[in-house]
């Protein structure tokens, strides 16, 4: 194995290491299969999220569940606690399987000489106790303290604004806002393309 000398931080486990939108859509579609209005609103929220303008947080996820619970009405009402419990269970099951299929990426990055950490502010992910995942409620503070050489993320607000002096930024997705603010940024479609740019 090559000497690990390049410091890489993967700033968002959910949106960079795997396709969180795909997982979230599957869970929400299952929970709210009898609520087309909620599914329509959810698609709009995901479009806004894809622009990288809004940061992601557990607080935001919980607020989303509260609103969806209210919108579920009376006839097919779903309580907040039921939504939360079902979401957590399905998330952990789906994500654990996806993560196990991508362990080779960690080894590949190590072999290319990168020391790295994977950040998450998602308590569900943290409770899976997976390799090299660090749980933090304040990613911004962590990134400022670590100040990595390379930063891989998906959201300007959550990730890049906290590390203005990185040698290179890699964005998973379109990164519209990120491209407006950063010069040394490369966009990739998914994590499978990371080896083309690192």
Predicted regions and their residues:
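Short hydrophobic segments within beta-strands
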Residues: 10-13, 18, 119, 152, ...
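Short, acidic loop-to-helix structural element flanking the phosphoryl-transfer center
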Residues: 86-117
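A metal-dependent, Asp-based hydrolase signature
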Residues: 40-92
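Glycine/proline-rich, flexible active-site/cofactor-binding loop segments
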Residues: 115-131
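Asp-based, Mg2+/Mn2+-dependent phosphohydrolase catalytic module
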Residues: 1-4, 128-151, 155-198
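Active-site neighborhood of HAD-like aspartate-dependent phosphohydrolases
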Residues: 1-59, 63
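Glycine-rich phosphate-binding "P-loop"
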Residues: 85-96, 126-136
């Amino acid at each position: 194995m090559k000497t690990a000398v390049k410091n890489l931080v993967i700033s968002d486990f959910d949106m960079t290491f795997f396709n969180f939108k795909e997982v979230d859509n599957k869970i929400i579609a299952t929970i709210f299969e009898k609520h087309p209005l909620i599914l329509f609103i959810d698609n709009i929220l995901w479009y806004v999220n894809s622009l990288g303008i809004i940061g992601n947080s557990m607080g935001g996820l919980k607020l989303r569940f509260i609103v969806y619970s209210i919108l579920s009405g009376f006839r097919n009402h779903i309580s907040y606690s039921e939504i939360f419990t079902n979401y957590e269970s399905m998330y952990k099951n789906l994500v654990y399987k996806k993560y196990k299929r991508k362990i080779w990426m960690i080894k590949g990055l190590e072999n290319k000489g990168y020391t790295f950490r994977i950040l998450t502010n998602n308590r569900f992910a943290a409770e899976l106790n997976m390799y090299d995942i660090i749980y933090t409620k304040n990613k911004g503070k962590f990134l400022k303290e670590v100040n990595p050489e390379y930063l891989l993320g998906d959201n300007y607000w959550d990730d890049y604004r906290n590390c203005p002096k990185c040698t290179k930024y890699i964005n998973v997705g379109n990164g519209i806002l990120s491209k407006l603010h950063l010069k040394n940024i490369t966009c990739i479609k998914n994590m499978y393309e990371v080896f083309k740019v690192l």
